[in-house]
Amino acid sequence: MKKILILVLFAIAITSFFYFDLGSQLTLANLKEQQAAFDAQYQAAPFLVIGIFFLVYVAATAASLPGALILTLAAGALFGVIAGTIIVSFASTIGATIAFLSSRYLFRDTIKARFGDRLKAIDEGVEKDGPFYLLTLRLVPIFPFFLINLLMGLTAIKARTFYIVSQIGMLLGTLVYVNAGTQLANIDEVSDIGSPGLLLSFAALGITPWIGKWIVGLIKRRKVYARWTRPKKYDRNMVVIGAGAAGLVSSYIAATVKAKVTLVEASKMGGDCLNYGCVPSKALIKSAKVAEQMRHGDVYGLNKVEPEYSFKAVMQRIHGIIADIAPHDSVERYTDLGVDVVKGYATIVDPWTVEIKREDGETQRLTTRSIVIATGGRPFLPDLPGIDEVGYVTSDTLWEEFAKLDDIPKRMIVLGGGPIGCELSQAFARLGAEVVQVERSDRLLAREDDEVAELALGAQQSSGVEVLTGHDAIRCELVDGEKRLILSADSKEKSIAFDALVVAVGRSARLSGFGLEQLGIETDRTVVTDDYLATLYPNIFAAGDVAGPYQFTHVASHQAWFAAVNALFGQFRKFKADYRVIPWTTFIDPEIARVGLNEQDAKAQGIAYEVTTYQMHELDRAIADSATQGFVKVLTPPGKDKILGVTIVGDHAGELLAEYVLAMKYKLGLNKILGTIHTYPTMAEANKYAAGEWKRAHAPEGLLRWVERYHSWMRR
């Protein structure tokens, strides 16, 4: 109601201005004719005239009415340069701020609801460089004054910042036009003031903030490097620390463009994904899925059987798969590609020097123009009393430790309700272990929507996992030789016996042991980088888990391109790391794959959306495969086919998601997916049918009624 009242008042003010032709009074000719009368009134009652003039100026600018330039000239003619400049400076800034706040109050919520995804990107830019943009616009008076006020109100810039920057930015222009007003008799046209030379001067002045920002950045960079001595020449163009996904891709790119690059790895080539994460876990999941299908053979018209297997053979298969993939990431392959691969520990001695302690005990120092930190992450270990006494494995160490066992641990506890915890819990339960999965929050997969988390819970339970959400692990105990985990829930303690404790509560970046502290490179759970993945030192970059914000192998590879290209060619052009379309998959059965926004994200960001859902039990191929659990859920702006985000639950969801990733990357809407031929019968048809559901919901009902009449007429 308040918004409507304010809009009505603005409408009355604007209508009155044009209805009573008040604009005809705000002309240069009328101002010159009335100057003598205005002077007389000012001499008779100076404070009253100043007060009225001030309020009129504020009202005119607040309502975004034309005539501000004439009023500014009038201030010079009436009050002189100093007084006129002061009056106009405050009146114009106050009026502009009122217009700014009115725009924000009246329109921001509506604009945010409709264009929230775009506004978020603008707000992020405004938060970083907003004052510079605003100052530039204010310094160059060719940009419409009222438009700046209204548009800035739609952004997240603070009102105080808007006021201060506006007053400073408009001061010089105000002074020029007020001073021109003191020579009113010599001005025949307003264009006499805004000569091309003057406007060019304002434009040059407008870039001053950016020049200043560049100078400040230059001084800051020189200050950062001040205590170090730059080498006269370099041994390498780039040194990469860490041979996981980010390190391998960074060094590969450098070698491809003929740069001289050294890749340093202290442990196994391929990093966590090959040796401890993605590859072994997916191999385990496959064995477990086959075992589960054997138990439910009757679903496929076969006899159901309890699988007999050797746990040691399962673990040997996993290590065999790692060995089969290892040549893809081997020292030999990357050496053949042109990368100098060194096995050893790297320490950054100064911004251009890396010291390497080789496996053979020798120490080598290399100077380099740029460094890429790709040291990855490690499992996070909670501060749990007694955990060292009872023993534990992490998602990294279990592959080596369990390979030593003849049989699967009978009783297992998995700490963690995220993707890793869910995948391991389900897999080990399907292989016959009694698994208890413990999660301190009230549901699994906290980043997913409620219905997805509920489906994941059902999948875990149907696989035999006992899921305890809302339980906090508080200590471990060894009682009469039996290992026990003590949990707390609802102020009550619960004790669970176990044979193996798997810790899967997340991962943390590897930040110590290679010189960050000595160089003063800032860290905050990850290495702090700018939009270009550069650290405090512009020639030192970070990529992968150590840089965040996502801990996915494919994101590490994605970041590696930006880190390598910016490190090698940043002096010509730099590229901001692009996180607009990041997919991920949780590989439980059924798989959960997502890209972009889900409902809880959209609600948190205040983005208006529509939901289109297609159930897998309606898909022919899913029915044929007896894999009908799941759905495709697409978020779009109201009334538009633009894809904001997609969640797919079902068989091969990770593969199905790729079509939506491509569509979002290249701004293809649901209409394009609907118009694409999909092979029958495939799971991929679910994507087309989801697009069809959206189209059906947005059918032009009015037009269809006329089409129906047409067909009825044609049957006569």
Each model region followed by its residue ranges:
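Membrane-interfacial helix-loop-helix
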Residues: 13-53, 89, 93-149, 154-155, ...
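N-terminal Rossmann-like FAD-binding beta1-loop-alpha1 element of flavoenzymes
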Residues: 236-263, 421-430
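Glycine-rich flavin
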Residues: 253-259, 264-408, 441-445, 451-452, ...
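Glycine-rich dinucleotide-binding loop and its adjacent helix/turn
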Residues: 278, 375-434, 438, 463, ...
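A Rossmann-like FAD-binding core segment of flavoenzymes
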Residues: 304-305, 340-343, 347-361, 366, ...
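FAD-site-proximal beta/loop scaffold in flavoenzymes
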Residues: 388-408, 495-573, 658-663
